[in-house]
Amino acid sequence: PVCFDAKECHTDTFPLANVHPHQVAFMEQFEKQEGIAFLLISFTHREEFYYLRFSDLEKFWNRALDGGRKSFRYEELNPEYILPKKHGILVPYLDVLQKDLADRE
C-alpha cells in the first residue's frame, strides 16, 4: 500500500509548517504496517517535483522538534529522488517509487 500527500513550494526552503502533526503520525503508523509513505513536493520555481521519503521527512521533523530548523532546504535533498521529466506524464513518480522500494531492501 502507498500513502502520500502533495505539497507545493515556491522557494528552495520548504517550511515544515506545511505538514501537520497528524499527517506525520499517520505516515509513521502506515510505514510501521509495511506501507510506503512519502510526500510529492512541487518546487514550482524550479519546475521540479521531488519524492520525499517518509524517513527523510521524519529526520527533518525530529530535527525541528529538537529545536533545530523548522524547514529544510532543497540542497539537503537527495538528487536521486527528483522526479524525471517524462513526455505526457505530469508527475512521473512510479520510477522513483521503485527506487525507494529497492533502497529499502
Where do the language-model regions lie?
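Charged, low-complexity, helix/coiled-coil-prone segments
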Residues: 5-6, 38-40, 101-105
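Short, compact, well-ordered microdomains
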Residues: 20-23, 31
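Helix-rich interaction surfaces within compact, conserved domain-sized segments
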Residues: 50, 54-105
